[in-house]
């Protein structure tokens, strides 16, 4: 059975190019939506800095992740990043680790927060 691939990237945008970078991220999310093996492909902004992002991708297998790396969507994204980043991104790739997804807990009882 193929093992999943999880890639997490820290992206460092330039404040003056924020709108362009966010538009590129949105377009890339849309462009990858139909790729085989794509389980999750999401860009998020950090809480403390509106120009720092986290990109999380989950792929069904090494093969589907590699296919994405060769895709037009990935290549278009990479080419468009050139003038939008303050410094190079940092990526961590996790392969085949067991994943546990706990059942969601209910909303907290507001009385317990006192």
Where does each model-flagged region fall?
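Short, flexible segments with low predicted structural confidence
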Residues: 3-5, 20, 36-38
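Short, surface-exposed ligand-recognition loops at beta-strand->loop->(often short) alpha-helix junctions
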Residues: 12-21
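Glycine-rich beta-strand-turn "strand-cap" elements at beta-sheet edges
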Residues: 1-3, 42-49, 79-114
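An amphipathic, aromatic/His-enriched active-site/gating alpha helix that lines ligand/cofactor pockets
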Residues: 27-39, 58-92
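Short, well-ordered beta-strand segments in beta-rich or mixed alpha/beta enzyme
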Residues: 5-12, 42-69
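Short hydrophobic/aromatic-rich motifs at helix boundaries and adjacent loops
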Residues: 1-2, 33-36, 49-53
